[in-house]
Amino acid sequence: MSNASTLALTLSERFPRPWARLADLTLVLAGSLLMAALAQLAVPLPFTPVPITGQTLGVLLVGGALGSKRGAASMLLYLVEGACGLPVFAAGGAGPLVLFGPHGGYLFGFVAAAYCVGLLAERGFDRSFRSAILAFGLGELVIYAFGVPWLAVFVGTRQALVAGFWPFLPGAVVKAAAAGVLLPAAWSAVRRLDLDKDEDNR
């Protein structure tokens, strides 16, 4: 049986890439565009400047699928796009004022979280639900480790926890679980493709 799927570190490295550099750039750009799309799934909350968005799910998926370096690069590109004025942040936000505003820490946390999740994915944590949800849960915590202290500079520590951490925990668990289902499912599909190819080659 082919062992290609076990040798690949991440899903993005699983498929043949004759033009590796171009493929890397394409994947990094695609990750930033996914983030931009998920950022528009934003629900503002009356008690906090931090909206509920699909961004954190995007961070987990991009980091897990692209790996540490490409995942972090994709998040950096996303931040650059927003800082340059492209409406890629939550609810079409853009510009340095958003990037360095009250929820800017969460945005910078995306880079670190994608790197951490990617690093764990490169070590096989994205292959099963149990290990994947641990990796993605850690990724969520990394985002809050950046976001909450940053928000505290604007509103104080207690209010930062009330407005920028506790209300988002249930959603964080759901997103980590969703990513924990999607990435192992993608690997299962890859393994099935390998089996089909092996059968065809016999």
Predicted regions and their residues:
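Hydrophobic alpha-helical transmembrane segments
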Residues: 25-30, 57-61, 72-77, 103, ...
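Membrane-embedded alpha-helical hairpins and interfacial helices in multi-pass inner-membrane proteins
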Residues: 48, 120, 124-202
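Helix-boundary and loop/linker segments of multi-pass membrane transporters
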Residues: 16-21, 49-50, 90-91, 96, ...
